[in-house]
């Protein structure tokens, strides 16, 4: 009997040992050495880019890589310019989805929510505003026809309040600049984005900062990321969050500051169907709605640029580049996203940074990820 019991015990232990062979091995981590080499070399050879940093986020594993070179550290706080656009739209979508507390439809005319008599087409929606299809003259007019765009300069200045600026933009025409009917043409950036912020404050019943904290920062656990208006003062930025100005009139399309860790949480939200940690900030449908292509001629959703697919493939890459060189992106096929921070605050060569990431760094990261898939 004892011998039989020992035999049964031996068979049981062998079975337990064999069953462990069925467990899959731990997933190998990608090797991002070549990605780091690229970023380190870039900041060493580009005189207007003395530093750079990046963070890579996996949909399920979270942060899988972080690095910094030159005069940046992994904790640097940077001004993001247009890499603010996706976060801004994320808040607008959160308001749109809060049916229990907020009367707001992002696809309804903004005249439903604004108390002023406007000069622009009454059919304009907030969706039009943040897809750059409102018909209101866009951002590039400030560079090519600055005198004609001057009546709308409040969006770039730290003085005043967001609602005061929104009223000015909504009630002041730009007669010497071309405009179109809403949802008929793509005209990037500018007044339409600041006007969307005014809509948010009116429907949300609080300042942009209060709404940002309530709907995004607190549920996502953000520590640093917030909006201000340093666009006219960016060349003096020293990385101190206390130097953020224009808190009462934050710039919607380009006023955000952040560190890597906070921005990574926003990327994770868009990878995980609107979930930030244990909190559902947006619905899966809301996240997908931001990626819907509204301007196929250029590839743009709401905040996201949509990268053309490779021949025979489908769209998988969405990005949000900024004037100072930073760029964020998500890859819905590989289930990862990332952001690279640059600080080219002269504004003369930001595209060198974001363009280099798009054409050179992203393929390197894709290769590293594909090697362990």
Spans of features found by a protein language model:
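C-terminal motif of bacterial Sec signal peptides marking the signal peptidase cleavage site
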Residues: 13-15
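Catalytic loop of the DD-peptidase/beta-lactamase superfamily, centered on the K-T-G motif
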Residues: 18-67, 75-76, 204-206, 218, ...
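Sec-dependent signal peptide recognition
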Residues: 1-8
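Short active-site loop at a secondary-structure junction
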Residues: 48-50, 70-129, 177-191, 251-254, ...
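Catalytic-site signature segments of enzymes, centered on catalytic residues
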Residues: 66, 77, 141-233, 250-264
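Non-transmembrane alpha-helical segments in soluble domains
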Residues: 36, 40, 93-96, 111, ...
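Active-site helix/loop module of the DD-peptidase/beta-lactamase fold
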Residues: 83, 95-142, 191, 198, ...
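Hydrophobic (often cysteine-bearing) scaffold residues that line and stabilize catalytic clefts
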Residues: 31, 35, 80-84, 88, ...
